[in-house]
Amino acid sequence: CPWAHRTLIMRKLKGLDTLIGISAVNSYMGEHGWTFAPAPETIPDSVNGVARLYELYALADAQYSGRATIPILWDKHQRAIVSNESAEIVRMLNSAFNEVGANGNDYYPAPLRADIDEWNAFVYPNLNNGVYRAGFATTQEAYEEAATAVFAALDKVEARLATHRYLAGPRLTEADIRLFTTLIRFDPVYHGHFKCNRRRIVDYPNLWGFVRDVYQLPGVADTVHIDFIKAHYYRSHPTVNPSRIVPIGPALDYSAPHGRERLGA
């Protein structure tokens, strides 16, 4: 899930590994939603011992009847959900734990907030959510409209990254994290599964360099599991992929030199 992935990256970047534990659901989301069914990617809920994500929502609110979504920031002392909104959790991880052991790196710095907010407002509807609009479209017209918007957005970001190492300037911010989690999934999943196949990210020199740049930051690679990402999408969306066959490719080298240091540190 690209939204949950944002929070895992921020946890790594802020050095919160020992302060905030994680549980990870099974990559397959079936008719009963997310579960902690045993699998290589699953990290069981060691705090409450639940088998299904919905049980956590029920623990927090016995009357809860909505969807059980990820990510969740869970308060194990209060046995409560602090937040299940990824944007909120990313902001919390960025600053709320600085006094108890997180490093001082700021990914939402005051001087850049206007630019960060502007890029977030552009990237979310056109890319983060745009690929889903294309993938789950049920008419040709809706699909073409969504897919066209995706590639128009990629063109705009490609142009921006030609002259700026990161979206808001020379330093990494939360806007880049939000962009990265969509781009890292694009060639393995969205290009084929969601029919966003006009071009691949590897066909955009600056986008592809950006993906490798962020991937190679300390700790980020630990949060990327392409096999699990592919398994989730291709197995969990029977209306899009009825056979649930997971493709074996593509072969991508995220560790290759990116050369983006020339744009500033």
Regions found by a protein language model. Give the residues of each.
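C-terminal alpha-helical interaction module
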Residues: 2-265
